Amino acid sequence: LPYLLLLSTIAHAFQYGLRWYIAGRLPLSNGYETMQFLALCVMCFSLLFCRWWRNVVTFGFLMSGFALLVSYLGQMNPQITPLMPVLNSPWLSFHVSFVMMSYALFAFLFLNSLTALALIWKVGMNEQVTSLSLTNRLLLYPAMLLLGIGIALGSVWANESWGCFW
């Protein structure tokens, strides 16, 4: 299963890189592109953690599948269009990238917590619940750090674009 995840990640990264090359900018300007990036982040984090965390491959497929499903729903537009001038800033790309990476980690925290809640009622599962709780605590720190950096970069972008942080 990890090899299938690796193959999927390579294919998705190739598609994302192709979109980046065609657009001439990092594709993070609309909901479709942002959800594509979130799915890529989830897959990359799944590959990073699959040696230490047993459920991460399943969680990675599930969360990246949901992100890709949302990217293809209704009003998400897959067309590559020129950016509005206010969005044509490298600060915006950094801001969105860091926030999406934190959201990918928060998605793992969410599924990990749901798994712990499902196991807490079973007899003899205290060790697994404790392990899931420890994993949550370990992933929460980088998720919060990435979110904080993303918010700070967003305020720098807002200051550059509009002249004030908020």
PLM regions: where:
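Polytopic transmembrane helical bundles with strong interfacial aromatic enrichment
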Residues: 1-166
